[in-house]
Each structure stands twice: as C-alpha cells, then as structure tokens.
C-alpha cells in the first residue's frame, strides 16, 4: 500500500509458486515492500513456513501420495497432477499483479505450472518472474535468458542468477563447499558413511558402480546409458 497526498494506492498482489528457500525469500521481500502475498507449494508441510514470513498459504486440493522425498524436496508428479494444479491455480494467477515461480524438482526439468492461457487472464501490465527458467521454466511463456512480452504481461526468465552477484555467490559457494568437505573428514581422513543422509544424496559412484538413484534414473533415459549400474 502507498499513501500519497492524492490518496491511497492499493498494494500489489503477489503470488509465489513454490516455497523453498527462493520462494520464502520472495515472500518475505514482497511483504516488506507492502504487497499482499499468497503462495502455494505441493508440499502441505511448508504451510507454517509460508505463514511465518507473512504469506497466505493457498489451499489447492491435490491427490498426491508423496509430495516430498526424504530430504524434504518436492517429488516429480504425474502430468495429471500438474494439469489439475494448473486448473486450480488459474483463479489465483488471474487475480495477481506479480507471479514469482520457484518450483523445481531435483534432477528433473521444471514442471509447467502456468499456461499461456493463464497468463492471458492476468491484468494488463502484470509481471511474471520465472526463477525456474534455467531448467525450462514453470511458465509456458518463459524464454530462458530473456525478458519477453506475452499476452500483455512481462515475463522474465533469468538464468545463472549467481553470476549477477559474483562476490556474494563466491563467498556462499566457498563456505558450503568447505563445510561439505569437513563433514566428510574424520580424524584427518576422508570417511564415507553410506548411512549418512548427506553422503547418500551426493555420492554418485563407488567401487565402479553407480549408487546414486537419480543418476541411475537419468542414465536410463539416455540411449546406451549406465542404468545397469556400471560407471563409465
């Protein structure tokens, strides 16, 4: 909301799709700027996190058996689930001035959650920021690496966002890598514990075998891949 001598301007309506780290940051930033913020995530468990940073969690009833994996990340869903999600999100998107897309599935292309028809129903001059553009985008109108006009809306598809803040990105990357390596060291030597959740998620091959489920699954989709388990 903006108050001026000429009157009061109503706040912008912001809808955030995906409530991971980027989504929660987008919610809190938009709230600090005075926007009315709503958000949705296929994982109902994040509702409290959305509300804790000032967003309103949008209830969208979906028949999803397993919305998240053991690490808390969203799982890939069948196309019928995404189709139903688009149908139920259409009204919320149509009422929004800004939509920020952050929905990603580890190891998979970004799910398509906003169709061109949904963009066309948004108010003229609306803005869509698709943070999933590098993985294909959550919005059908997104062009990775470009800002385009679609159905009267501006669609921004940034890629390699870390390069826009190289100093801070380098600091965070170095800190995370050093913390990860120290986690693997025990008494001055590298120690790989197969029961450790971090090791399970990051270990790709061991003793000539592909042990990471995501890599095995990705290999199965490539002709001549190593789905059988042997590493190249």
Model-derived segments and spans:
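Adenosine-phosphate binding glycine-rich loop
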Residues: 2, 11, 139-230
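Glycine-rich phosphate/diphosphate-binding loop of Rossmann-like nucleotide-binding domains
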Residues: 1-92
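Structural motif
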Residues: 13-15, 35-38, 55-57, 97-99, ...
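Short, solvent-exposed amphipathic alpha-helical segments in soluble enzyme
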Residues: 31-33, 53-56, 114-121, 143-147, ...
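Catalytic cores of large soluble enzymes that bind and process phosphate-bearing ligands
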Residues: 42, 77, 81, 88, ...
